[in-house]
């Protein structure tokens, strides 16, 4: 069953950007492993088969060890992932400075333009909590759409 991304897409991207903004600048090995698992689970969480395929492809090409090495790297990964999807859908590209400011992540124009890296303290339980919330939201949308 596929659910129209217009119903869940904005909340999904907002969640990913918030997760990255809350990630530690210098994450522990455990936090990096949890985040790697979270990123790899993203395609499975998506309620759209086409979106799942595209996410598997995009994530499969990423150097996840580098992506999870810092807040900046993780934030840039999700920022670039979001813009990659927007380009595929012929939607406007997000401006790096705007997105970084919105999520209160320090902005370095050079590094952001080069593509890849990014304030509250990250803890492993947050990934689990956000993943559960995302699954509940997606399941709720699917449940409601069946009864319309």
Swiss-Prot record:
Annotated keywords: Disulfide bond, FAD, Flavoprotein, Membrane, Oxidoreductase, Transmembrane, Transmembrane helix
Topology term for the membrane: Single-pass membrane protein
The keyword Ligase appears for this protein: no
PROSITE patterns: ERV_ALR (PS51324)
Cofactor(s) listed: FAD
Domain of life the protein comes from: Viruses
Primary localization class, coarse: membrane
Gene3D superfamilies documented for this protein: ERV/ALR sulfhydryl oxidase domain
CC terms in the record's Gene Ontology section: membrane
Domain ERV/ALR sulfhydryl oxidase as annotated: residue spans: 1-103
The protein's Enzyme Commission number: 1.8.3.2
Enzyme superclass (EC): oxidoreductase
Annotated S-S bridges: 48-51
Role description: FAD-dependent sulfhydryl oxidase that catalyzes disulfide bond formation.
Protein name: Putative FAD-linked sulfhydryl oxidase 096R
Organism: Invertebrate iridescent virus 3 (IIV-3)
Lineage: Viruses, Varidnaviria, Bamfordvirae, Nucleocytoviricota, Megaviricetes
């Amino acid at each position: 069953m596929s659910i129209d991304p217009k119903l869940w897409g904005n909340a999904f991207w907002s969640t990913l950007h918030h997760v990255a903004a809350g990630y530690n600048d210098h994450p522990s090995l455990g936090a990096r492993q949890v985040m790697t698992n979270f990123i790899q689970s993203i395609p499975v969480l998506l309620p759209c088969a086409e979106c799942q395929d595209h996410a598997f492809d995009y994530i499969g090409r990423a150097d996840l060890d580098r992506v999870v090495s810092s807040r900046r790297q993780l934030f840039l990964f999700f920022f670039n992932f979001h813009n990659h999807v927007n380009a595929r859908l012929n939607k406007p590209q997000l401006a790096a400075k705007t997105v970084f400011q919105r999520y209160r992540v320090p902005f370095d124009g050079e590094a952001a333009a080069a593509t890849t890296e990014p304030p509250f303290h990250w803890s492993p339980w947050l990934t689990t909590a956000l993943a559960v919330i995302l699954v509940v939201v997606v399941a709720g949308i699917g449940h409601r759409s069946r009864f319309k």
